[in-house]
């Protein structure tokens, strides 16, 4: 008997031999075959296109069909203007029919780059015989394209590839039949539809959608159709659609409950450079320290979300064996053990000496309300020197703390006087909370090696508790604003560069030079970034605005959820302050990933007329997608709108009554757009049948065509696995 517990070994990924099959052009001695050999020190060992006019391409033919998993590009030993800044890769079993496998770009350096190619459809691997590389843009504007070396890797074991090839052929045939079925049904060719389905036994869609089509398109039973849609929503079938919709931000200012008459002493005052953490289990926000414009603070507060109330835990933590007054420090919370850690601070050059420059490290126990000094000087214990504007993350599972970056404070001269001494930045450290020991994981490095990381200040660092990676991006190093983005796997000690910041994705990623506050949602695999005001006076513009960005970790893509309408000064009657927080820096943002709410407090609004001004406003931010209830109401509206239009043709009086009652209740009358659309519907009562535009289906009656159009709209809310194919048969006809 075979070993029951044995796991099948993963198929081996190996280099795939190929030959040059076709090319668009080449110039002089820069032949396509040159990409078969890797000679980084030979400037002539490359393919170069004759021009940069599209389409330029190379088609590679594999020795035999294979699952092509990766493509590697070799380069010249120096940067080169002809390197590919943007390119696409396509693949397929024949050169006439290819699928896009990759859209990316190369860095303009000498390092080889490997990219993963799309090689699965619905989790099933598919084979390719041909690979087409299409250059789109070179690093030097208007230069010809050059490719120095190409390597393909994947699986070409016939025992694995052949079943994939069989599946792929069957899949293509099945999709072709489904396109025919869709076409026949749209045109009401009932006999042809039924005959093809009976013969092939291939389903066009999930039975539930067939049921909806039957009730809606064939029978016009709108009530039954609504019931089926309601069942679909309640069964969670619209969840996938909801997860793909863009967020809309909803800010609301929090006005905490006041217990005393004066109302001043029972909430934190104005400040910037403070720190906040949140206990998501108890829904409590903890706030400590900061700078009020004239002095550092040592007060410690807790805000209960449930009670909507601030409680002052301590007016001065130093008096309770805790940290002294400070700002630009960092805090992190261990929710499992209910403990808060704080490290670092900013010290003015006038008060710096060998004693004050020691980096103390404290832990606060929430349940016993006590502070404990873990270290008088972390540098003496193998940890970081005294730093400010660093970042700190907690790994509760392994009981570890990670701290990275920050400016090291020194005795000599002012921090701003770069001539007195080159600024020093702190590396990446790990603190084992159990053993109370520090370990240096990465020193600050300016080298561009694959495992090197560059220290910085004012950056973002987040810990993903599920994939166990730190994510680091942005920040500043001396006068340079950084926009690279990398992850660090804490278990394998490996750095992965997500973006080196050289690609000009202007407008597609958060801008550098602005204060960024970031949070992470490990469950949704999302990083959230609030971009505010620049600390740099020269960079501060009058029309500065907040923007909120979301990075999708799985899709490796940024999206901007909103940029505020800088409306306060353009429209004095509308105060921006009432709707959302004004742009600022030195503020704090925390995220409750359990209840999906952000909390923001205080900061510096950067008013040159009042440089000491600090804020004490408190806000919550919810990122909202369409709810199930909204989608159900919207679907009912679409169905009833269509029903009304049908009635309007037959019985205008009955239609008017239907409009005023049944259709009216599916509209949100507080929404101006919905209200306007609803008001325009009445015009249907005065249209003749010929006024309606059909789908262009000359062979089906108007009602059938309109109902089919409504059905196609409703289908969009269902998961792709349930729906008919997205394309149309007629679209395959080329002129």
Curated annotation (Swiss-Prot):
The modification N-acetylalanine is found at residue 2. Keywords: Acetylation, Cell projection, Cytoplasm, Kelch repeat, Nucleus, Repeat, Synapse. GO terms for cellular component: cell cortex; cytosol; GABA-ergic synapse; nucleoplasm; postsynaptic endosome membrane; postsynaptic specialization membrane of symmetric synapse; ruffle; ubiquitin ligase complex. One of its GO terms (biological process) is actin cytoskeleton organization. InterPro entries: Beta-prop_ATRN-MKLN-like (IPR056737), CTLH_C (IPR006595), CTLH_complex_component (IPR052456), Gal_Oxase/kelch_b-propeller (IPR011043), Galactose-bd-like_sf (IPR008979), Kelch-typ_b-propeller (IPR015915), LisH (IPR006594), Muskelin_N (IPR010565). One of its GO terms (molecular function) is protein homodimerization activity. The keyword Lipid biosynthesis does not apply. It comes from the Eukaryota. Kelch repeats lie at residues 284-330, 339-391, 408-458, 469-515, 526-578, 597-651. Its main location: cytoplasm. Residues 172-204 form the LisH domain. Residues 206-258 form the CTLH domain. It is found in: Cytoplasm; Cytoplasm, Cytosol; Nucleus, Nucleoplasm; Cell projection, Ruffle. SMART domains: LisH. It holds the Pfam family Kelch_3. The LisH mediates head to tail dimerization. Component of the CTLH E3 ubiquitin-protein ligase complex that selectively accepts ubiquitin from UBE2H and mediates ubiquitination and subsequent proteasomal degradation of the transcription factor HBP1. Required for internalization of the GABA receptor GABRA1 from the cell membrane via endosomes and subsequent GABRA1 degradation. Acts as a mediator of cell spreading and cytoskeletal responses to the extracellular matrix component THBS1. Homodimer; may form higher oligomers. Identified in the CTLH complex that contains GID4, RANBP9 and/or RANBP10, MKLN1, MAEA, RMND5A (or alternatively its paralog RMND5B), GID8, ARMC8, WDR26 and YPEL5. Within this complex, MAEA, RMND5A (or alternatively its paralog RMND5B), GID8, WDR26, and RANBP9 and/or RANBP10 form the catalytic core, while GID4, MKLN1, ARMC8 and YPEL5 have ancillary roles. Interacts with RANBP9. Part of a complex consisting of RANBP9, MKLN1 and GID8. Interacts with GABRA1. Interacts with the C-terminal tail of PTGER3. This is Muskelin. The lineage of its organism: Eukaryota, Metazoa, Chordata, Craniata, Vertebrata. The gene is MKLN1.
């Amino acid at each position: 008997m075979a070993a029951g517990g044995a796991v099948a070994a993963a198929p081996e990924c190996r280099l795939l031999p190929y030959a040059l099959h076709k090319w668009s052009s080449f110039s002089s001695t820069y032949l396509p075959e040159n990409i078969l050999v890797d000679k980084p020190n030979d400037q002539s060992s490359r393919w170069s296109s004759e021009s940069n006019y599209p389409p330029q391409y190379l088609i590679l033919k594999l020795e035999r069909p294979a699952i092509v998993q990766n493509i590697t590009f070799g380069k010249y030993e120096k940067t080169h203007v002809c390197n590919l800044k943007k390119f696409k890769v396509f693949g397929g079993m024949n050169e006439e029919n290819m699928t896009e496998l990759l859209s990316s770009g190369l860095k303009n350096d000498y390092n080889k780059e490997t990219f993963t190619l799309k090689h699965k459809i619905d989790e099933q691997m598919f084979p390719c015989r041909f690979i087409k590389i299409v250059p789109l843009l070179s690093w030097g504007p208007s230069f010809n394209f050059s490719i120095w070396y190409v390597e393909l890797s994947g699986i070409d074991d016939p025992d694995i590839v052949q079943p994939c090839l069989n599946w792929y052929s069957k899949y293509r045939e099945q999709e072709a039949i489904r396109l025919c079925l869709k076409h026949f049904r749209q045109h009401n060719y009932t006999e042809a539809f039924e005959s093809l389905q009976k013969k092939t036994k291939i389903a066009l869609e999930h039975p539930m959608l067939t049921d909806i089509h039957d009730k809606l398109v064939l029978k016009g039973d709108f009530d039954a159709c609504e019931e089926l849609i309601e069942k679909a929503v309640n069964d969670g079938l619209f969840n996938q659609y909801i997860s793909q919709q863009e967020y809309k931000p909803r800010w609301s200012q929090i006005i905490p409950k006041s217990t005393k008459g004066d109302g001043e002493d029972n909430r934190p005052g104005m400040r910037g450079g403070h720190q906040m953490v949140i206990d998501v289990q108890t829904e409590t926000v903890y706030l400590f320290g900061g700078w009020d414009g004239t002095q550092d603070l040592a007060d410690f507060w807790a805000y209960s979300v449930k009670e909507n109330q601030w409680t002052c835990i301590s007016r001065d933590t130093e008096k309770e064996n805790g940290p002294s007054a400070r700002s630009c420090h960092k805090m992190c919370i261990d929710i499992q053990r209910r403990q808060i850690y704080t490290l670092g601070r900013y010290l003015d050059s006038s008060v710096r000496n060998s004693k004050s420059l020691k980096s103390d490290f404290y832990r606060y126990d929430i349940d016993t309300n006590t502070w404990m000094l873990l270290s008088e000087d972390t540098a003496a214990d193998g940890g970081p020197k005294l730093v400010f504007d660093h970042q700190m993350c907690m790994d509760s599972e392994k009981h570890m703390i990670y701290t990275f970056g920050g400016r090291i404070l020194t005795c000599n001269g002012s921090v701003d006087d770069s001539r007195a001494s080159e600024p020093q930045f702190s590396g990446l450290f790990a603190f084992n909370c159990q053993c109370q020991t520090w370990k240096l994981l990465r020193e600050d490095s300016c080298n561009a090696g694959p495992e090197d990381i560059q220290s910085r200040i004012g950056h973002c660092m987040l810990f993903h508790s599920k994939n166990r990676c730190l994510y680091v991006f942005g920040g500043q190093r001396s006068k340079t604003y950084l926009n690279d983005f990398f992850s660090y796997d804490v278990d394998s000690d490996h750095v992965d560069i997500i973006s080196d910041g050289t690609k000009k994705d202007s407008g597609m990623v958060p801008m550098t030079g602005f204060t960024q506050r970031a949070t992470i949602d490990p469950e949704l695999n999302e990083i959230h970034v609030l971009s505010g005001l620049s600390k740099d006076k020269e960079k501060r513009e009058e029309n500065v605005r907040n923007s909120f960005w979301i990075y999708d970790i799985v899709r490796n893509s940024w999206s901007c959820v909103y940029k505020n309408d800088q409306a306060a000064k353009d429209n004095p009657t509308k105060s921006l302050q009432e709707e959302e927080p004004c742009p600022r820096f030195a503020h704090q943002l925390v995220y409750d990933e359990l209840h999906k709410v952000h909390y923001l407090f205080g900061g510096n609004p950067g008013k040159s007329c009042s440089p000491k001004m600090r804020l004490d406003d408190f806000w919550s931010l919810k990122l909202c997608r369409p709810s199930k209830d909204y989608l159900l109401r919207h679907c009912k509206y679409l169905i009833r709108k269509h029903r009304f239009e049908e009635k309007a043709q037959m019985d205008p009086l009955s239609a008017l009554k239907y409009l005023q009652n049944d259709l009216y209740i599916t509209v949100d009358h507080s929404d101006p757009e919905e209200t306007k659309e609803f008001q325009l519907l009445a015009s249907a009562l005065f249209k003749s049948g010929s006024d309606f535009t059909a789908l262009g289906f000359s062979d089906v009656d108007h009602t059938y065509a309109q109902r089919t159009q409504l059905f196609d709209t409703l289908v969009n809310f269902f998961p792709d696995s349930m729906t008919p194919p997205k394309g149309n048969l007629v679209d395959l006809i080329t002129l």
